[in-house]
């Protein structure tokens, strides 16, 4: 797995800082896949997306979940990963957490949760 992320989707400096949190390449690959998918569907780099892009992505993924193409848990995982990356970017920009600017977080509150 490449250490670098596609420059068309994310700032590679930020990605390199973020990926240091991962304990495995599998985790890194999962985050890359979900971020790429979101960016491809939005047609924008991650840092240029807004609440409308997140809403469209949610609606698209929810339709896939309702059709049985992905599970509710998978949808939750995708949003948890996207939320994590968005939150990280906000922390880097402001020096503190700024969850009010994370467009993914509000969707997580109503998503399927994994069983303990």
Regions found by a protein language model. Give the residues of each.
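Short alpha-helical hairpin
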Residues: 1-15
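N-terminal core-binding DNA-recognition domain of tyrosine recombinases/integrases
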Residues: 13-116
